[in-house]
Amino acid sequence: MKYKLLPCLLAILLTGCDRTEVTLSFTPEMASFSNEFDFDPLRGPVKDFTQTLMDEQGEVTKRVSGTLSEEGCFDSLELLDLENNTLVALVLDANYYRDAETLEKRVRLQGKCQLAELPSAGVSWETDDNGFVIKASSKQMQMEYRYDDQGYPLGKTTKSNDKTLSVSATPSTDPIKKLDYTAVTLLNNQRVGNVKQSCEYDNHANPVDCQLIIVDEGVKPAVERVYTIKNTIDYY
């Protein structure tokens, strides 16, 4: 992945030229993992992060925590979903991610530290020449992923039996505010939902506080839910 650095003139307006230059692109690992594990991708030399999703009552519904090496590999990843009462904790061990508690091999890796296979579910991933995951497949489904020139995930299409679910995201035209986006979900070409997110950003152009509005158009009348996302991020 080639990195595009923000010119100093623009950096002055954002953070001052005495600060670390802003990396505008996303690494293949960060972008691909965010697709698979459902969290907002981050940029720059991230050391560790926690991303917390809260509902309108301020109750935590989901939390994702990760630690990364200086090379951008995920050393550990924990996913807590309180709505579905699930917890997944993975730790890196050579070419696998193991369950942090049982040490069972859960995810096989390819290349430096990219997703390759989830043996228990029969899922395998394919990457493009730049190392981004662009396809996932199993006996039951096929998924295709899309990215922009900076590696930002633009959505995915999932085909399973006679159903096709497509999510298409449109990020802000401001490269600094990439996580300000809108998205539309189609089921068999029929619109069933939309999403809008707006954020405040830190000096690395990563979101710190976000408002996420999710509208379920598959029911009548449509149901709108408002969430808050808070990120705590440490850098190298």
Curated annotation (Swiss-Prot):
Cited InterPro entries: UPF0257 (IPR010646)
TM spans (from-to): none
Keyword Cell membrane: yes
Lipidation (S-diacylglycerol cysteine): C17
Listed GO CC annotations: plasma membrane
Subcellular location: Cell membrane
This protein's UniProt keywords: Cell membrane, Lipoprotein, Membrane, Palmitate, Signal
A Pfam family reported for this protein in Swiss-Prot or TrEMBL: UPF0257
Top-level lineage group: Bacteria
Residue positions of covalent lipid attachment, annotated as N-palmitoyl cysteine: C17
Membrane topology: Lipid-anchor
Signal peptide feature range: 1-16
Entry's family note: Belongs to the UPF0257 family.
Name of the protein this chain belongs to: UPF0257 lipoprotein YnfC
Organism: Escherichia coli O45:K1 (strain S88 / ExPEC)
